[in-house]
Amino acid sequence: QSPEYHRVTRFRGNAVPMDRPGHYVYLRDAKDGDYWSISWQPVGKPLDQAKYTCRHGMSYTTYECDYKGIKASQTLMVPMDDAVELWDVRLKNTTDKERRISVFSYCEFSFHHIMIDNQNFQMSLYCAGSSYDENIIEYDLFYEEFGYQYFTSNVTPDGFDCLRDSFLGAYRTEDNPIAVERGTCSGSHELGNNHCGSLQKDLVLAPGEEVRLIFMLGEGSREAGKKIREKYSDMANVDAAYAQLKDYWENKFAQLQIKTPNEGMNTLINTWNLYQAEVNIMFSRFASFIEVGGRTGLGYRDTAQDAMTIPHSNPEKCRQRIVELLRGLTTKGYGLHLFSPEWFDPDAKKEKKKPFKSPTVIPTVNAKDIVHGLEDACSDDALWLVPSIIEYIKETGETGFADETVTYADGGEGTVYEHMKRILDFSAEQVGATGICKGLRADWNDCLNLGGGESAMVSFLHYW
């Protein structure tokens, strides 16, 4: 799924302050009005007054804060079986006095589509609405038939805000939201404007008491939210979701373990390298410093390199990506630098898509313009696919894969082996006066793109 379409919460790639907005939990002391966030940002209490920790694990992130006798944590994770993000919040009163603490959640909903989210505000500011009922915030993008999200909790809220600007206040930021500062949400909701998910819960913590709250940000309508809330209000189901994720990754790691004299190197290779590879093969580079979610499709070289890394841990996904890349190859032997797999997938049109009814004219892509010419071909793109296929066959033993028939992007079909041969032949033909492979539009270094040069790296890759 591309985050160009149907993104749930807002992402500003070049925001100031940096890395905003997030999925935040604020805490407020009713006695003196002091407030802070469980994660260091956005409130940013001085580090000599509060202790903060952030830990990234396998498919979860935990923030921890120890401030003024309140130890708090917030863990974000997505269960494998449900389209919901769980915010597992725990608070403990470590003092010998009763504490009255208000908890405020906050996330900022988007207008789903990156173009609508960043332009034509005359339209976009009226394209969504929010409502609160049965302790659930429902967010609705009007131009999508199924454009709903919800935000709810396992406890009965004492307040809510559905409007971003009502929660934050005029000329304020996530640093100092007016709702948290005054200690109460305003109950805002509206058809139109910018929306958020904020639920308020007022707690009374006895000395040493610990409480656990679960906030749920999910895909679907209020009815879907009710079902998810019922399920994850049972802490046993939350813990089971953690256990399922843990088992999933332990099974991945068990496929291959590297041992070196350096423990840091072992952790890097066995844990984080595989985790990064698995995430990349699933999501590609859809959201990164390059695209911030605005580039739909697969980068040819990126995906070919991704496929090379996980045939032992995820052979099914490796095979899928290889086939998609083979379909994105032209009969001349170069790959389409950027393409959507569905363009060349014969079964893609059979999938049920969420209809998006744009109020403005969106030009239809002409099929003949999808396949770019040699002038836009990168010399290294398709070469990475050859070793990826070889590694897949070596790991799985599926030698018959080389004889399977796959289509070309510009028409016709051939075996996997024939695709590989065209890739190698293309590089052998695209050489300069010295016999070194041409750089074409660019080799692996996209910044060297003035054309006319030769690439030692591509020549080495071709020989390999």
State where each predicted segment sits.
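Anionic coordination/interaction segments
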Residues: 1-303, 315-328, 355-364, 391-395
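A glycine-rich phosphate-binding loop feature that marks nucleotide/adenosyl-phosphate handling sites
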Residues: 106, 342-343, 441-445
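Short glycine/proline-rich turn/loop motifs
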Residues: 285-291, 365-369, 443-450
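Ser/Thr/Asn(+Pro)-rich, low-complexity disordered segments
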Residues: 204, 209, 295, 382, ...
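Short clusters of hydrophobic/aromatic residues that line enzyme substrate/ligand-binding pockets
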Residues: 258, 283, 401-402, 439
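Aromatic-rich carbohydrate-recognition surfaces in CAZymes
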Residues: 26-29, 298, 303, 307-434, ...
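Hydrophobic, small-residue-rich alpha-helical packing segments that form membrane-like cores
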Residues: 50, 58-63, 81-84, 94, ...
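Short, charged, low-complexity loops and linkers
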Residues: 256-260, 403, 407, 415, ...
